[in-house]
Amino acid sequence: MIDQNHDSEEQAQMQKLTRTVTLTVALTLVSGCSYFGVYKRDLAQGNLVTSAMAEQLQPGMTRQQVVNLMGSPMLEAPFDAQQWDYVYRLDKAYGGVEQRRLTLTFQGNRLADIDRHGDFSRPPSVADERGIGPTDSTNARGNLLNARPDDE
């Protein structure tokens, strides 16, 4: 009779241990699941060049006038001091990559040629920092060029 009580106690403890381990494993597996994915941000790099800035460039401008208008170039060709590159790259977290490049060629101290690559006609849209997912295309706050400090 003592052996039967001892066996039933062992079985009860074993069942309790099995339930505890099963519950722990299940909770661990479920905790890795969530509705929201990994948080991603839009990553903008380089010189932001707008169409308004590019349109103000005129052949014959001096290097200093170009720097005053555009800022310092992202790249100066190491073997050709006559070429400046203004590169802008927007790696959208929930989309593709948008890249623009403006290559300026000088003759001496004067701007001689302007070469555009990419779509300068519209400003790049960067995701709203307060959101969790992709930018809603109707959300004007996601556009840095239209953002105002009083937007809340």
Swiss-Prot record:
One cellular component term from this protein's GO annotations in UniProt: Bam protein complex
InterPro entries: BamE (IPR026592), BamE-like (IPR037873), BamE_dom (IPR007450)
Main localization (coarse): membrane
Taxonomic source organism: Halomonas elongata (strain ATCC 33173 / DSM 2581 / NBRC 15536 / NCIMB 2198 / 1H9)
Residues carrying lipid (N-palmitoyl cysteine): C33
Lipidation (S-diacylglycerol cysteine): C33
GO BP annotation list: Gram-negative-bacterium-type cell outer membrane assembly; protein insertion into membrane
Free-text function comment from the UniProt entry: Part of the outer membrane protein assembly complex, which is involved in assembly and insertion of beta-barrel proteins into the outer membrane.
Membrane topology: Lipid-anchor
Name under which the protein is recorded: Outer membrane protein assembly factor BamE
Compartment list: Cell outer membrane
Superkingdom, taxonomy of origin: Bacteria
Keyword Nuclease: no
Subunit structure: Part of the Bam complex.
Region of interest (Disordered), residue spans: 114-152
Gene Ontology MF terms in the entry: protein-macromolecule adaptor activity
Keywords of the record: Cell outer membrane, Lipoprotein, Membrane, Palmitate, Signal
Signal peptide: 1-32
Lineage per the UniProt record: Bacteria, Pseudomonadati, Pseudomonadota, Gammaproteobacteria, Oceanospirillales
Family as reported in the entry's similarity comment: Belongs to the BamE family.
